[in-house]
């Protein structure tokens, strides 16, 4: 298998952590790719993902799996199933719903990054950027109060949440999430004890 990814992508980090935790990391070849709004990458769009998003998992038969959650679920299935994503029952739907929130938080944070760094300064839309940041911030508040998510055995929600917090450090270093959300701070410190989390930290901004 080959994973098209960027070391800076929180979505790709989620897949990398999942692969390590599932014991599959040695079965994946990592291929660095660059996708930037407004910049052409026709080869990636035509050959890998028309949406021009990372990561993408290219299987040995040439087929492609896109979306970080779908890739993580595929890897979980390869590892026997039910390890990071519950196989059935109410727990499965809680995990899928919580992960959808995390995915939306990361989407909003990425849009804030693009608004500031990619969009021409004269077109910057402050209210739109603030609205998207608030979605991520209120999402953090929700998880800060969720003792179950913060304390249960490792799953894809916890992996996704630590990627949210890591991306906040990477791209929004002065946002103050540790001061605002002490339970998330303790959770992040505990998660950083895992090798999979430590070695996947984004490069210095």
Task: List where the protein language model places each region.
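Short coil/loop linkers at secondary-structure junctions
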Residues: 25, 82, 175-178, 198
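Conserved residues at the C-terminal ends of beta-strands
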Residues: 60, 162, 203
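GST-like fold's C-terminal all-alpha helical module
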Residues: 102-189
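GST-like domain detector, emphasizing the conserved glutathione-binding G-site
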Residues: 1-124
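Short, hydrophobic secondary-structure boundary micro-motifs
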Residues: 82-87, 152, 198-203
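Non-transmembrane alpha-helical segments in soluble domains
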Residues: 72, 76, 96-99, 140, ...
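Charged phosphate-binding loop/patch that engages nucleotide di/tri-phosphates or the phosphate backbone
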Residues: 186-200
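Generic structural signal for secondary-structure transition and capping sites
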Residues: 80, 107, 148, 196-197
